[in-house]
Amino acid sequence: METILGMTAIAVALLIGMGALGTAIGFGLLGGKFLEGAARQPEMAPMLQVKMFIVAGLLDAVTMIGVGIALYMLFTNPLGAML
C-alpha cells in the first residue's frame, strides 16, 4: 500500500511540475513571437494581441486539466483497488 501511495505522490508531483514547466516555456515562446510580430508589423498588433490571448487561455486550460487529473489521482487514489 505504501508503494502505491508513494508512486502516486511522485506521479502527481511530476504531472504538476511538468505542466508548469511546459506552460512557462509556452508563454515565453508565445510572448516572444507576439513581440516579434508586433515589431515587424505594428498595424497588426491589435489583431495579434487578440490571438495571443486566445492561445494563452488555451495554454492555461491544458495546465488546469493536468492539475485536475493530478488532484483526482491524489485524493481518490484509483490504484488503491489493485490491492
Swiss-Prot record:
How it assembles, according to the record, is: F-type ATPases have 2 components, F(1) - the catalytic core - and F(0) - the membrane proton channel. F(1) has five subunits: alpha(3), beta(3), gamma(1), delta(1), epsilon(1). F(0) has three main subunits: a(1), b(2) and c(10-14). The alpha and beta chains form an alternating ring which encloses part of the gamma chain. F(1) is attached to F(0) by a central stalk formed by the gamma and epsilon chains, while a peripheral stalk is formed by the delta and b chains.
TM region positions:
10-30, 52-72
Q: What is this protein called?
A: ATP synthase subunit c
Which NCBIfam families does the UniProt record give? ATP_synt_c, PRK06876.1
Q: Where is this chain's protein located in or outside the cell?
A: Cell inner membrane
Family, per entry:
Belongs to the ATPase C chain family.
Give the chief site where it resides.
Answer: membrane
Organism lineage string? Bacteria, Pseudomonadati, Pseudomonadota, Gammaproteobacteria, Alteromonadales
Q: Which UniProt keywords apply?
A: ATP synthesis, Cell inner membrane, Cell membrane, CF(0), Hydrogen ion transport, Ion transport, Lipid-binding, Membrane, Transmembrane, Transmembrane helix, Transport
